[in-house]
Amino acid sequence: MWFKNLKIYRLSAPWALNGDQLEECLARFAYQGGNNLEMQSLGWISPRENGLLAHTLNGQILLTLRAEKKLLPTTVVNQVAKARAQEIEEQQGYKPGRKQMKEIKERVTDELLPKAFSIYRDTRVWIDTVNHWLVIDAAASAKADEVIGLLAKTIDPLPLDNLYVEQSPAAAMTGWLAADEAPANFSIDQDTELRASGESRAAIRYVKHSIDVDDVRRHIQSGKQCTRLAMTWADRVSFVLTESLDVKRVAPLDVLKENPDAATQNDDEKFDSDMTLMTGEVAKLLAELVDSLGGEKRV
């Protein structure tokens, strides 16, 4: 249930859609399985096996975007097209021209697509209508952009803004390391990266290794800035903050994994319990993280 990598956005206006309205919007762009004539297709699927495209609980909304991509190598298309071209050459007495060859490849692609294997990738979206967050569980910006693109078509207008803070994460993290002191309710863990801003982009990394403060200060004095920093919030959630304000490798600590009711809960109850826990904890983490970066910047 827990999102691992957070791409963080702000809802720029109060959420106006009720459950039925949201479901209707999502249904227009639902994933259509079995469409064999597209190399790639996108659409919304149910986050659970209950058929609804949005799972809503106490103002928290969970969505899932499915991306399907057909595996049809160009070499295969070219081989089949070449064989077809030879047959046509024998029939008409001369080689197919460039335009005809293009048409042959298009026909071959259409014929092979229904037989091609597919790979699927699901990306989850959490909309917090109470605290006005929109969070995408994606490590890469391209995947987040894919979600935002379809979401903007699904909900028009989409009340969404990027998140801006007063102090850049790189400057803040560098300051925390130099002072050997994390902001209130946070602690610094053992993974970090410092990188030079010049052409060399020289970097020093600590990976699961105690951070030598004096060594780090020397690197900072030489012009390096912290670009990644592993931290723990409230002894409850560990994560890595990046210079681009992404939150990666999110993991609940043992204190949050203990659920005395788990043995008596059915699957639906367990899902809702996990969702309530994750959304509640991460919403508080994000609020305190933004505060530690000087607060939200209005642009």
Curated annotation (Swiss-Prot):
Keywords annotated in UniProt: Cytoplasm, DNA recombination
Location within or outside the cell: Cytoplasm, Nucleoid
Annotated InterPro entries: RdgC (IPR007476)
GO BP, one annotated term: DNA recombination
Molecular functions per Gene Ontology: double-stranded DNA binding
GO cellular component: bacterial nucleoid; cytoplasm
Keyword Nucleus: no
Protein name: Recombination-associated protein RdgC
Biological source species: Bordetella parapertussis (strain 12822 / ATCC BAA-587 / NCTC 13253)
Lineage of origin: Bacteria, Pseudomonadati, Pseudomonadota, Betaproteobacteria, Burkholderiales
